[in-house]
Amino acid sequence: MMRSHYCGQLNESLEGQEITLCGWVHRRRDHGGVIFLDIRDREGMAQVVFDPDRADSFAAADRVRSEYVVKVVGKVRARPAGAVNANMASGAIEVLGYELEVLNESETPPFPLNEYSDVGEETRLRYRFIDLRRPEMAEKLRLRSRITTSIRRYLDENGFLDVETPILTRATPEGARDYLVPSRTHPGSFFALPQSPQLFKQLLMVAGFDRYYQIAKCFRDEDLRADRQPEFTQIDIETSFLNEEDIIGLTEKMVRQLFKEVLNVEFGDFPHMTFEEAMRRYGSDKPDLRNPLELVDVADQLNAVEFKVFSGPANDPKGRVAALRVPGAASMARSQIDDYTKFVSIYGAKGLAYIKVNERAKGPEGLQSPIVKFIPEENLNVILDRVGAVDGDIVFFGADKFKVVSEALGALRIKIGNDLKLHTCEWAPMWVVDFPMFEENDDGSFSALHHPFTAPKCTPEELEANPATALSRAYDMVLNGTELGGGSIRIHRKEMQQAVFRLLGIAEDEQQEKFGFLLDALKYGAPPHGGLAFGLDRLVMLMTGAQSIREVIAFPKTQSAADVMTQAPGVVDAKALRELHIRLREQPKAE
């Protein structure tokens, strides 16, 4: 081996030992005739000193520049008093260099690594192989590896088998567009890249492999956001003969162990909350419990007022009127309120009413608001008592359809919590349970809230009689307002699966065409089964404090789903297209 140690492994216990390092020159300094090289590798940094008494190595050190690849032989020694660098793991020692071999030279990088400045993301992605040399980026990938190692070990120890499922499969309706792959040997037919291993892992349960896991690549052709990529990694888990409480307990323990091992963070038992409670209190099915603000329903106090903005939704069975108290924010400037009003409009809210509580003892006179005149004093007092308002608070109101109010005030709650730094803790894990089985579309049809293979908490007959009120056996793990993982008990009886398909408007011939293999499998002794899938990229993003999953993926795509480093996607030559039986239509020329 060319090296004896990584730079990040050096410490006082190695003092006096001769070691060999290989890495990149991070920084070169010439101080009073002595040359210092900071050598960097994936594990960290080490300072190497070259003395003019060793002419050959000193001359070689004088010639090297940043990002040269070098091999250094030297002896570990303690740094002189006053020269200890507390910012380096190896900052108490240095290496006295005996030999220096340049393994490769480097041109000047497109951006500096030793004095990292605000470089545009596209430049970083174009030269990702250089960007990943930065210590903070290397640390993220190291932590990602530790996370997957911890998870694999836990699942292996608990009897799970690591089984790979196909990447080339067929298109199934799972909510997003598929990436399609044309078949050369079957003209006119296409494979699809899997959006998840969902159906294959269920078939593994039918086959008797009762504890499965896989760290799986998944693909979705959808619009990108901060936490989305066209290809992403999933920690996929499926079990047989366990109920939802068993699966929740098993995976919660895995996450608790993971955080203890990797971040030395200890979690207690995760609280559970129903979907309905989460939406009413927090306006979200993935509430951030670090934030103490809550939504409070007040429609019963506003259903008789003459102000139609409130009374209309208050008397609408599908409407909602809710309040959000922000403690100590009565001094909020009108310009800030206007900004928040504009913000909630993104979610469909038509306005943002408010009451500033200056002095409650004075009654309506002590309240500052354009809406106070529309609300009887008795109702005002009930509302302020219900939300816990005291002098110095501001109370915001939303009134519209339930979905609009919940999403708008829920998003405002998060924004204000961040703006005013209201978080009460660093980590807040939880479970959300009792999700609706379906969501109703504007035309009265139904869509699966999770996916069509989720089991309901009722019989097929009850489900078809009352689909709008049916609850599913689904559960989501949420951390700091981010969905870490979602899962459910699956349908294991053919009759129930067909009932769900019918409610989703999937006719019998389409059921056979797209899911015939699954329906066939359910006839042959499918066991009760369920599972869960974690988004690995999101998990690593949260654990490293990164702002985007692009920061924790070695070679991510841009927000336009392109790889600027390899220039993918690219044009394919005509011969390859002919072999695939594809002919491209000419794009109409712009006028």
From Swiss-Prot:
As for what it does, the entry says: Aspartyl-tRNA synthetase with relaxed tRNA specificity since it is able to aspartylate not only its cognate tRNA(Asp) but also tRNA(Asn). Reaction proceeds in two steps: L-aspartate is first activated by ATP to form Asp-AMP and then transferred to the acceptor end of tRNA(Asp/Asn).
InterPro entries the UniProt entry points to: Aa-tRNA-synt_II, aa-tRNA-synth_II, aa-tRNA-synth_II/BPL/LPL, Asp-tRNA-ligase_1, Asp-tRNA-ligase_1_N, Asp/Asn-tRNA-synth_IIb, AspRS_core, GAD-like_sf
- Keyword Kinase present in the record's keywords: the answer is no
Task: Identify the species of origin.
Answer: Pseudomonas syringae pv. tomato (strain ATCC BAA-871 / DC3000)
Family recorded in the similarity comment: Belongs to the class-II aminoacyl-tRNA synthetase family. Type 1 subfamily.
Q: Which UniProt keywords are listed?
A: Aminoacyl-tRNA synthetase, ATP-binding, Cytoplasm, Ligase, Nucleotide-binding, Protein biosynthesis
By what name is this protein known? Aspartate--tRNA(Asp/Asn) ligase
Gene name of the encoded protein: aspS
Task: Give the location in the cell.
Answer: Cytoplasm
Q: Where does ATP bind?
A: 220-222, 229, 483, 535-538
